[in-house]
Design a protein with these regions (language model features):
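AAA+ P-loop NTPase catalytic core and its hallmark functional loops
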Residues: 1-179
Length: 180
């Protein structure tokens, strides 16, 4: 966890990697809440995740009524995080098609989201960053490109070493729920 926090403090994106059941989503949610005060800026990766889900969409009624403008842009969670200087969570990054994954490369390198239709762009506010999760041994995953991997610090979350350790983790988690 210390490495994850240090990564985000140095303005580098974080990739939490591990097999299913290693609490990647739980860790990303709690890091985002602790650092940004908001863990709800989330893109859920699936095989059907489109580039618009990451970048922005259009309010077609507004587009038809007033033409192309920033008022017709429907910001994605990524765009909202950039505008507000918060962390955005990308769940299941490796389930997103490879060609869509590549849209993160310029976001992470330049911290800029172009809107070419308007000849505009969104510059990330201070504090913006990405926490992504990925399964490394699951079916239906797309390999990350080396260019994208280079833009993340990768933290591998291991499985518990024993049944006893797993029971202890569950007991601790259940006890903490009672205090919330």
């Amino acid at each position: 966890i210390e490495i994850a926090i240090a990564t985000l403090a140095t303005d580098r994106a974080l990739l939490l990697l591990g097999v299913p059941g290693t609490a990647k989503s739980w860790v990303s949610e709690h890091l985002a809440a602790a650092i940004s005060g908001d863990s709800m800026l989330v893109v859920q990766g699936t095989a059907g995740t489109a580039e618009e889900t990451i970048r922005y969409g259009w309010n077609y009624a507004q587009l038809l009524a007033k033409g192309p403008s920033m008022g017709a842009v429907v910001p994605s969670p990524v765009m909202r995080a950039m505008q507000t200087g918060k962390l955005v969570r990308i769940e299941e990054l490796t389930r997103i098609p490879a060609e869509v994954q590549d849209s993160f490369i310029s976001l992470l390198s330049e911290k800029v989201l172009p809107i070419p239709e308007l000849n505009e762009y969104v510059q990330a506010s201070k504090g913006f960053n990405i926490i992504a999760t990925a399964n490394d041994r699951d079916r239906g995953v797309n390999e990350l490109s080396s260019a994208l991997k280079r833009r993340f610090n990768i933290v591998v979350l291991p499985l518990p070493d024993s049944v006893e350790e797993e029971v202890q983790i569950v007991e601790t988690r259940v006890a903490s729920l009672g205090r919330s």
